[in-house]
């Protein structure tokens, strides 16, 4: 049996955590003894409890300082790896990658690259700091056995910089809401065409511009639901009109997707958005900025139309196009389950793990 440990900053229910959880839930337990190592505080206690009840060993390092970890003070993590005697370490994120690259271990070291660091780090940290973080991260990645990008579009960037890189697209389980929301509860008419955005309200997500353009181009029967919080929340509220519902952070976004028609994102950079996959799983059309990862998922819908792309110059015309698409919710759901499922993602990762095991 292969002993595998997934390593992440902390485990929650969204973002890179959802990729880790989907892998854990879909690997063959007769072949893998699975552990999870979390580095910092911030774990969702419900998720940790469910994992342990499902036979996963969870190590919570609860280290306090991310910067100290990057500077080499990571003894708790090193001790866990030494005692665990793992065959495979699979890290997620810059700090886990850096720590893994410094280990003296016989374990084969995987990582999943969840973003385009050249865009994401620049937007998050500014030019000077982003150069430092990119150099640090690349140096770590080159020491690992395999770097798996979360999309082909991220792979197209990283293949220029890494010799040990491949890609496996993110996939998700079929999503289910934990509650029922009605359109009346959010003051939306039953016959309205409902657009929805779910995510952080920050500059990288370009949400202020999106609201401005929606206000400019929406028709009388169209509404936009905005789920999320963040640094741009006050500015978003100032730009909204009476067709925009600012609903704040919601723990059950799928319930709101179930009363929507179109998922919209004007993000400037994405790895392979889990929210987009969740929207497809709910049968929503996609109305997305024309960044590479968005182009990738829309272009996959060769036999059925799954959405429309826009840029800052043509969004008015793109609104006309999305209105004209004759979509079929059931076919969109089927498209997601056939092409972007957690089961398919896990099968592909299993193949990569097995290759490494055969080499040993």
Language-model-detected regions and their locations in the chain:
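A conserved mid-protein helix/loop that constitutes part of the nucleotide-sugar donor-binding site
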Residues: 14-22, 193, 197-216, 231-234
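Membrane-proximal helix-turn-helix segments that form the acceptor-binding/catalytic region
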Residues: 75-78, 129-147
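A charged, aromatic-enriched C-terminal amphipathic alpha-helix characteristic of glycosyltransferases
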Residues: 15, 327-358
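Short His-centered aromatic/hydrophobic patch
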Residues: 91-97, 113
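Aromatic "clamp/platform" in nucleotide-sugar-dependent glycosyltransferases that forms part
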Residues: 249, 268
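Donor nucleotide-sugar binding/catalytic pocket of nucleotide-sugar-dependent glycosyltransferases
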Residues: 142-179
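N-terminal strand-loop element at the rim of the active site
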Residues: 6-69, 154-157, 230
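Short hydrophobic beta-strand element within catalytic cores of glycosyltransferases
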Residues: 285-288
């Amino acid at each position: 049996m292969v002993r595998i440990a997934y390593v992440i900053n902390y485990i929650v229910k969204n973002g890179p955590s959802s990729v880790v959880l989907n892998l854990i839930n879909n690997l063959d337990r007769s072949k893998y003894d699975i552990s999870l190592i979390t580095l910092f505080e911030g774990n969702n206690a419900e998720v940790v409890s469910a994992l342990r009840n499902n036979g996963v060993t969870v190590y919570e390092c609860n280290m306090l300082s991310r910067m100290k970890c990057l500077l080499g003070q990571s003894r708790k993590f090193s001790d866990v790896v030494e005692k665990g005697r793992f065959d495979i370490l699979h890290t997620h994120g810059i700090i886990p990658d850096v720590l893994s690259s410094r280990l003296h271990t016989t374990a084969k070291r995987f990582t999943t690259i969840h973003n385009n660091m050249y865009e994401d780090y620049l937007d998050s940290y500014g030019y000077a700091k982003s150069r430092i973080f990119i150099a640090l991260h690349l140096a770590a990645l080159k020491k690992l056995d395999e770097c798996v990008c979360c999309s082909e579009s991220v792979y197209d960037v990283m293949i220029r910089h890494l010799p040990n890189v491949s890609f496996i697209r993110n996939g998700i389980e079929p999503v289910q809401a934990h509650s029922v929301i009605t359109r009346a509860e959010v003051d939306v008419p039953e016959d309205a065409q409902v657009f929805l955005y779910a995510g952080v309200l920050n500059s990288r997500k370009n949400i202020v511009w999106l609201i401005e353009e929606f206000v400019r181009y929406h028709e009388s029967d169209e509404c936009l639901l905005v789920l999320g919080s963040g640094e741009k929340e006050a500015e978003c509220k100032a730009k909204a009109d009476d067709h925009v519902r600012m609903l704040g952070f919601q723990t059950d976004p799928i319930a709101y997707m179930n009363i929507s028609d179109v998922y919209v994102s004007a993000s400037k950079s994405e790895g392979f958005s889990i929210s987009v996959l969740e929207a497809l799983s709910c049968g929503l059309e996609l109305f997305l900025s024309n960044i590479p990862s968005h182009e990738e998922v829309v272009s996959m819908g060769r036999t059925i139309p799954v959405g429309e792309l826009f840029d800052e110059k043509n969004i008015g015309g793109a609104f006309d196009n999305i209105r004209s698409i004759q979509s079929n919710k059931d076919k969109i759901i089927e498209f997601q389950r056939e092409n972007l499922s957690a089961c398919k993602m896990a099968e592909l990762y299993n193949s990569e793990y097995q290759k490494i095991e055969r080499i040993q």
